[in-house]
Amino acid sequence: MLYYILRYINELYSLPGMGVIEYLTFRASAAAITALLIIIFAGQRFIRFLKSKFVEPIKEEAPPEHRKKKDVPTMGGLMIIFAIEVSAFLWAKIDDPHVWLIMLAVFWMGLIGFIDDYQKVVLKVKGGLAGHYKLIGQVTLGLVIGFYTWNDPVFSVLLSDTTVPFFKKLSVDYGIFYIPVVIFIITAVSNAVNLTDGLDGLAAGNAAIVTFALGVFAYLCGNAVYSGYLSIPFISGAGEVAVVSMAIVMACVGFLWFNSSPAEVFMGDTGSLSLGSAIAVIALMIKQELLLPVLAGVFFVETLSVSMQVAWFKISKKLYGEGRRIFLMAPLHHHFQLKGWAEQKIVIRFWIISILLFLTSLMTLKLR
């Protein structure tokens, strides 16, 4: 909204320096700063409110170290969502479909996560929202995103094609499977971030790194010169994705101000599902979803560890009459906790891995 107001003022009065509002880098930086300041200045008061109403009980099967977190409030994802939506509304071109589709994804999956958290914390429903209802929410979002991008002329330029990392001129056409692929990616990534949200700062830090990388890709895809030089598809309007991406990055960083160990607040499913859906939608819009197993490798491995644990437990029960485990506990971060690793060490090492994967993803721009 500020973009349109300042642009209108500039057209009327031609004030010196006002033309900077047209620069993506300026608006991306402004959105990032706005998101960060919203959380830092409103965070403490909001945490006090959450603590009076929304303290989630610690699961019995959780590692012993988690017992000391019994009084930490959840639903901190509401702060993240508010900061993202306000920052994007102020600094991005909100009439651009890239922008409002990301904002829709953040809001919708945040709502699903909120219902889940509310049932667990307030209504004391064990396990929260039933898994099939979450799945319905994810599929609904996937259908909306899929059908809209398939039919809207802004997106239909590339139709259902997507790029393949490490290959210069190779692309994949999903064809009639485009919408199922969209649904799968949104569901998989939102669940992956949700599974990773188990240690102080783990999900927020990794989400910030992954989204920053996607923001860089969005900026390059939205620039005809850079995209041509790097042999990646030029996507008109993708630059606005970079503005929203930076808002998400700094909303996560601002949240880390309170969520780093020892955490004062947890994001809950409210935050993890919304961040995961945002990452998925951004990747889909800039045709980098096939890069996610590399870029979002930490989320991918965390999810894989759960799948392997469950599968082997069921298989071994049939083979040996008792369920056996590959890991001490899944997701993987809990395995390392039970092996004696300090929580902060696990989180920082996972951040380092995400940074390495981010750099590897950037290398794919030239390794083609």
Curated annotation (Swiss-Prot):
Catalysed conversion reaction? UDP-N-acetyl-alpha-D-muramoyl-L-alanyl-gamma-D-glutamyl-meso-2,6-diaminopimeloyl-D-alanyl-D-alanine + di-trans,octa-cis-undecaprenyl phosphate = di-trans,octa-cis-undecaprenyl diphospho-N-acetyl-alpha-D-muramoyl-L-alanyl-D-glutamyl-meso-2,6-diaminopimeloyl-D-alanyl-D-alanine + UMP
Has the keyword ATP-binding been applied to this entry?
Answer: no
- Listed transmembrane segments: 23-43, 72-92, 98-118, 139-159, 170-190, 201-221, 238-258, 281-301, 345-365
**Membrane topology value:** Multi-pass membrane protein
The family assignment reads: Belongs to the glycosyltransferase 4 family. MraY subfamily.
What job does this protein perform?
A: Catalyzes the initial step of the lipid cycle reactions in the biosynthesis of the cell wall peptidoglycan: transfers peptidoglycan precursor phospho-MurNAc-pentapeptide from UDP-MurNAc-pentapeptide onto the lipid carrier undecaprenyl phosphate, yielding undecaprenyl-pyrophosphoryl-MurNAc-pentapeptide, known as lipid I.
Q: What is this protein called?
A: Phospho-N-acetylmuramoyl-pentapeptide-transferase
